[in-house]
């Protein structure tokens, strides 16, 4: 099997188009939205993806760095309790978290908070995704 994943989709319309094209996994990146809005949008994506038999990744917390020509070095670690609530309310298949990781090039090596990662793993039971790991 081959998985085709939409990473960092910015609108529900983009996610829907990807699903219509046969993507097997999608991500609506609502991580910059307020917590409740992220939950609301992600729930919509989970419901839509289920109609296509696709999996859903969501992002919680802010992963800084530079990607697609945009630069933002503001990293906010994912709060483990927020991750628990988010996963319970959305039923996402995988959760991208921020533990000090950053997209793209960074002038100083990031400090990863592995304790936070372990706590999120233990409290959610979901597969976790780390963006900016290379």
What residue ranges belong to the model's regions?
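Alpha/beta enzyme core
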Residues: 3, 8-127
């Amino acid at each position: 099997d081959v998985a085709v994943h939409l990473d960092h989709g910015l609108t529900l319309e983009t996610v829907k188009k990807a699903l219509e094209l046969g993507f097997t996994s999608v991500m609506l990146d609502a991580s910059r939205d307020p917590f409740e809005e992220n939950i609301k949008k992600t729930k919509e994506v989970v419901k839509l993806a289920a109609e296509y038999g696709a999996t859903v990744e969501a992002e919680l917390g802010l992963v800084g760095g530079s990607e697609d020509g945009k630069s933002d070095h503001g990293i906010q670690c994912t709060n483990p309790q927020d991750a628990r609530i988010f996963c319970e309310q959305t039923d996402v298949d995988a959760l991208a978290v921020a533990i000090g990781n950053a997209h793209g090039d960074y002038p100083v090596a990031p400090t990863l908070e592995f304790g936070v990662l372990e706590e999120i793993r233990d409290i959610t039971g979901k597969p976790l995704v780390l963006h900016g790991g290379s």
